[in-house]
């Protein structure tokens, strides 16, 4: 086992290392961020979750402090990496929460079976169709180009309520209320992610998300959706439930694409309530 210089832990996954942080004690809970994010995407709820759970928040390959995969970057290959990570750390059956792309990832792992316990999927991507596909791709692609171009002045922009509103209007129902630190961390992570462009294209135009027959997922499965999501529109929840008929849908009112930003306390309660129903055998790794 290797330790990063900044005190965060790293675990070898195939021919690379996966960076992650751990906080709290209790039944393990895995957090998986969205495209362009990192473990810091969970800062608004991480400490509250850690009061009751041992939280393990990862940086997926090609994001945060984890090196990219050597081959194709897709939901499938990222799922393979997470599966290997869990197996090597005695975390099979761990409860998991995903956000955005990470929300689709935990749904795919639930579909595969035998990997996760209870699952909470927050505003998952992958359930768009028709005009929504190019809208997702081009709007996010334009956003990342702008974010990269503005990096020299990003601290000043994120320190302003007006700047945060302009930057995060598509992602948050109340972007001006985001803390400057969280906003800056997210914009830095977006700009510095080497796997962003390839994964974005594959999310939009790659493999479509497969579903499961009813009664095939035995563990609790909850899909949370913001009523004001402008990235993955609320109407997409219909297809998500068609493909995952065992899931229960939770609506976040007056909430955008990231419930952990707009509705942190409600998100914490949803996660704890949804995952407490399944006491699995996952144990924390001895690191």
Residue ranges and their predicted role:
Residues 227-232:
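Acidic catalytic loop of the alpha/beta-hydrolase fold
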Residues 217, 223-225:
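Short beta-strand/loop motif that positions the catalytic acidic residue
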Residues 98, 102, 106:
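Gly/Ala-rich beta-loop-alpha elbow adjacent to hydrolase catalytic centers
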Residues 155-216:
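Conserved alpha/beta-hydrolase catalytic His-Asp/Glu region
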Residues 255-268:
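Catalytic histidine-centered segment of alpha/beta-hydrolase-like enzymes
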Residues 119-151:
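Flexible "cap/lid" loop of the alpha/beta hydrolase fold
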Residues 21-67:
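Conserved HGGG/HGGXW glycine-rich cap/lid loop of the alpha/beta-hydrolase fold
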Residues 77-94:
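Conserved acidic catalytic loop of the alpha/beta-hydrolase fold
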